């Protein structure tokens, strides 16, 4: 324990890397919503290539290594979507295509879990989706 902390800090989140005992450290999870046109229409959302919807999930929402994913509280409408996870080895901002490509460490398969009933209430009030998207165990992910 760090003596500067009044209690133990949580363990860092990391993901297995195929073919090595090393693990990939996770700092942030950025997500893009309404990026699949057919699914956006299915959800009665307007599809626009000009303005993607961004949201975040906390790193500790990740579930790895065949751990159980419990059914979350406060919902009766849990929805799942398969996702392509792009793991970046370096940060950046406003990157051109070549620099962005060079920042990619690898890829994984993920699952985006959403409490749709909570999301609908948030959308109706023009509120963020945090409670619908960023709950415990809402981001199962395979090895990179």
Regions inferred by a protein language model and the residue ranges of each:
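Catalytic-core "active-site belt" of small-molecule-metabolizing enzymes
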Residues: 1-144
């Amino acid at each position: 324990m760090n003596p500067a902390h009044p209690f133990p800090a949580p363990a860092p989140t990391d993901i297995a890397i195929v073919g090595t005992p090393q693990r990939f450290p996770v700092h942030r999870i950025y997500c893009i919503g309404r990026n699949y046109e057919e699914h956006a229409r299915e959800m009665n959302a307007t599809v626009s290539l000009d303005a993607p919807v961004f949201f975040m999930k906390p790193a500790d929402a990740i579930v790895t290594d065949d751990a159980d994913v419990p059914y979350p509280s406060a919902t009766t409408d849990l929805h799942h979507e398969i996702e392509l996870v792009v793991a970046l080895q370096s940060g950046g901002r406003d990157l051109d295509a070549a620099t962005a490509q060079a920042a990619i460490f690898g890829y994984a398969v993920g699952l985006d879990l959403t409490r749709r009933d909570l999301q609908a209430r948030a959308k109706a009030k023009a509120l963020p989706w945090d409670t619908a998207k960023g709950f415990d165990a809402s981001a199962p992910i395979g090895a990179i």
